[in-house]
């Protein structure tokens, strides 16, 4: 056997060219198709096998921000903080929340005291022996439409405030207090 008669196989990647396929299918000038025979045929001994190209995945390039972009990002963050678009941090605002809760509790106590005083005066006025006309006038006088907020602030508010101060006994009416003046009293109704 000579080296001319041996078949040779050439493998290439990504050969989508139509011209190469036509050359492969023609098989040479001798008119024989396929590889040459062992008995010494004069056909094209080269046969090319093509495989489809495998696309290689490109690594994502991590883009580093330029100094201008970093400063812009930082200024946007500061702007959001100024607009209070940041979620509140409970751990840092604990003292502030405690003071707000204390003020709200005092306000609720004052409101309930004022409501109970108003109901008491209204029931006392209705219980008196009156004619139907006098009762109607008394109800109109205590109706919410004729409610005088200035008179309420002058009279009812002071009485309610005294009761709250009686519970507090520290005299803390300011929001800014030091840590040594923190009131740990329980203002809930469960006592």
Curated annotation (Swiss-Prot):
- State where composition is biased (Acidic residues): 166-191
Q: Which UniProt keywords apply?
A: Coiled coil
**Cystine bridges:** none
Q: Which Pfam families match?
A: Rrp15p (PF07890)
| Signal peptide range | none
> Which spans of this chain does the record mark as coiled coil?
53-84
**Region Disordered: which residues?**
1-52, 119-191
Q: Name one GO cellular component term.
A: preribosome, large subunit precursor
Q: Where is the composition biased (Basic and acidic residues)?
A: 1-11, 119-153
At the top level of its lineage, which domain of life is listed? Answer: Eukaryota
Tell me, what is an example of a GO biological process annotation in this record? maturation of LSU-rRNA
The record's PANTHER family line, in alphabetical order, gives: RRP15-LIKE PROTEIN
What is the similarity comment for this entry? Belongs to the RRP15 family.
Q: What is this protein called?
A: RRP15-like protein
The organism is Caenorhabditis elegans
């Amino acid at each position: 056997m000579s080296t001319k008669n041996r078949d040779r196989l050439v493998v290439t990647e990504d050969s989508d060219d139509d011209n190469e396929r036509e050359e492969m299918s023609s098989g040479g000038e001798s008119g024989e198709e396929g590889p040459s025979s062992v008995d010494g045929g004069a056909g094209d001994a080269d046969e090319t096998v093509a495989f489809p190209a495998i696309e290689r995945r490109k690594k994502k390039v991590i883009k580093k921000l330029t100094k201008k972009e970093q400063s812009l990002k930082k200024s946007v963050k500061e702007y959001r903080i100024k607009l209070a678009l940041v979620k509140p941090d409970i751990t840092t605002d604990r003292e502030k929340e405690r003071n707000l809760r204390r003020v709200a509790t005092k306000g609720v106590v004052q409101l309930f005291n004022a409501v109970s005083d108003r109901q008491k005066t209204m029931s006392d006025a209705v219980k008196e022996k009156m004619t139907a006309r006098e009762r109607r006038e008394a109800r109109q006088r205590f109706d919410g439409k004729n409610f005088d907020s200035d008179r309420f602030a002058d009279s009812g508010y002071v009485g309610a405030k005294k009761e709250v101060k009686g519970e507090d006994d520290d005299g803390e009416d300011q929001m800014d207090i030091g840590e040594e003046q923190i009131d740990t009293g329980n203002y809930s109704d469960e006592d």
